[in-house]
Amino acid sequence: MKIDYLTLFPEMFDGVLNHSILKRAQDKEIIQVNTVNFRDYSINKHNQVDDYPFGGGQGMVLKPEPVFNAMKDLETSEATRVILMCPQGKPFSQEIAQDLSSAEHIVFICGHYEGYDERIREHLVTDEISIGDYVLTGGELPAMTMTDAIVRLIPGVLGNEQSHQDDSFSDGLLEFPQYTRPREFEGMNVPDVLLSGNHAKIDAWRHEQKLIRTFVKRPDLLAKYPLTTEDEKILENYKKQLKTK
């Protein structure tokens, strides 16, 4: 996978891209990353990339020329996913990350200032994505967040392919509780079932915990999850236990 970032602050990506999983993915040549400072493509003698909005208003708007010119220098195809990071976009999710993990080429357009000239949105972009209902100074941090979520799903990136399948949201539920040594710590014990060696019971316990944890912390996710009859019994029993406490 090739990933390009159009940004005014390419140095922001150095720390994230040169550590941990993203660095290993580059070392394995699974991904190729490239940052492009679209200020270099300004047609203004002062390298200006923004201007006042027509019709008046607060803030500055990114001009179309630098972004269009930068895109022309990239080797794109009809299959290239050009992502505009903006609060108006579709909320980012594990499902979107899974979809993008199969792309051969992704371009992130990371804006700053008040917003983008609408012609960028209309003529260059394939996907508008937001990482939440809040406003950040620029699109760099959302692009980094998305990159991490996407790349770890590409086959060969993680040491254990099962790892991401057990993550929260991978199957529509939150992840089950995790424990490691010591078995007992300051009076707090690891559940006996995890030490039993009975993998069927362990799997059943983990699924039960995922259901309960999702019900407690993210009940909205259960509305989209295909509950089985057994799942419904687990949740009913949990609700009864709550009433007796």
UniProtKB/Swiss-Prot annotation:
InterPro entries found in the cross-reference section: Alpha/beta_knot_MTases (IPR029028), tRNA_m1G_MeTrfase_C_sf (IPR023148), tRNA_m1G_MeTrfase_TrmD (IPR002649), tRNA_m1G_MTases_N (IPR029026), tRNA_MeTrfase_TRMD/TRM10 (IPR016009)
BP terms from Gene Ontology: tRNA N1-guanine methylation
Q: Which Pfam families match?
A: tRNA_m1G_MT
* GO molecular function, a single term: tRNA (guanine(37)-N1)-methyltransferase activity
Where is it mostly found? cytoplasm
Write down the EC number. 2.1.1.228
Q: Does the keyword Cytoplasm apply?
A: yes
Per UniProt, the enzyme's principal EC class comes to: transferase
Quote the subcellular location field of this record. Answer: Cytoplasm
- Enumerate the CDD domains for this protein: TrmD-like (cd18080)
Query: Which keywords does the record carry?
Result: Cytoplasm, Methyltransferase, S-adenosyl-L-methionine, Transferase, tRNA processing
GO cellular component annotations of the record = cytosol
In terms of SUPFAM superfamilies, this protein maps to:
alpha/beta knot
Under catalytic activity, the entry for this protein gives: guanosine(37) in tRNA + S-adenosyl-L-methionine = N(1)-methylguanosine(37) in tRNA + S-adenosyl-L-homocysteine + H(+)
**Record Gene3D superfamilies:** 3.40.1280.10, tRNA(m1g37)methyltransferase, domain 2
Chain positions recorded as S-adenosyl-L-methionine binding sites: 111, 131-136
Which branch of life, at top level?
Answer: Bacteria
Q: Which family does it belong to?
A: Belongs to the RNA methyltransferase TrmD family.
Q: How does it assemble?
A: Homodimer.
Which HAMAP family does the UniProt entry name for this protein? TrmD (MF_00605)
What does the function comment of this entry state?
Answer: Specifically methylates guanosine-37 in various tRNAs.
Q: What is this protein called?
A: tRNA (guanine-N(1)-)-methyltransferase
Organism encoding this protein: Staphylococcus carnosus (strain TM300)
Primary gene name: trmD
